[in-house]
Structure formats: structure tokens, C-alpha cells
Amino acid sequence: MQILEHGQEHGRTLLFFPCTAEPVWAFDDTVAQLSQSWHIFQVVYDGHQPEYPGDFTSVEQTVDAVISYLKSCGISQLDGAYGCSMGGACLTRMLALGEMTIGRAIIDGGITPYQLPFLVRKLLLARDVLSFKMAANSRKVLEAAF
């Protein structure tokens, strides 16, 4: 994992956790604008960019590495953080750990695990899969949805 920094001369801090398979350039315009007044930390997951090879292993390991990196840079709190999809799961984990204060957090479509017994989770999975298959195979359902 790598963390790219932009706008290091600014005091306000903002962390970006991207979604799965999100290339670095996807945040280029946003980072260019925000780095004019914020110190931006942009997370690049292992295996998500040719320059940063490796395999993404886990949300937990990523969050631990991000916290460790920020603390090594003298950052003890963040003014803001953004996480999209898998990045939302990373941000949710970071908030749950409570190891670093985050002033504002935006969780965009964060994936979170069900806190239910195994059998109930499997039944919910079966329901979801069946629902998607029925919707995908039924013109009437698709027309009603859209």
C-alpha cells in the first residue's frame, strides 16, 4: 500500500480511501482542487496501480498501515476523511477502532458485514442472489424497476 500526499504546506488534513480497482488518476481533479487548501492523503491499495504491485490482503491490514503511516508523519487527528465502497469499509473500520480522531467522515456506499449468526447470513445471501437472478431474468421486474 502507498499513500500519496498533496498540499503538504496546509494544516487541514483530508484522507481519501478509494473503492476497489479505483485508479489513482480518478481523484486527479478532486485532489488538484482540494490540495490548494488541504493536506491530502490519498491511499493506493496494493495491486491497484501498476507502479504499486502486490496483492490487497484485507481492510484491517490496510487501516492499520494507514494509521501507522499517519502517526509516523506526526498526524494525530484528521479534519476529514472520505471512503467509497471498499474505501467506505476501510473508513468505517478506522472510525470503529477510535485510534485517530476524525472531524468529519463521508462514507459513500460503505460495505459493512452483517452482525448476525452464520446461518442467518447465508439465508440472507441466498435471498439476495435469488432476487437478483429473478430480476435479471424477468423483463416485467426490470421494467417495473426502471
Give the role of each language-model region.
Residues 13, 39, 80, 102-104:
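Structural signature of beta-strand start/N-cap positions in the alpha/beta core
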Residues 96, 102-133:
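Flexible "cap/lid" loop of the alpha/beta hydrolase fold
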Residues 41-82:
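Active-site loop/oxyanion-hole signature of alpha/beta-hydrolase fold enzymes
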Residues 136-146:
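Helix-loop "lid/cap" segments that line or gate small-molecule binding pockets
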Residues 29, 93-97:
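Active-site signature of alpha/beta-hydrolase-fold catalytic machinery across serine-
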Residues 4-50:
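Conserved HGGG/HGGXW glycine-rich cap/lid loop of the alpha/beta-hydrolase fold
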Residues 27-28, 51-56, 116-118:
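Conserved catalytic-core motifs of eukaryotic protein kinase domains, centered on the activation segment
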Residues 83-91:
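Gly/Ala-rich beta-loop-alpha elbow adjacent to hydrolase catalytic centers
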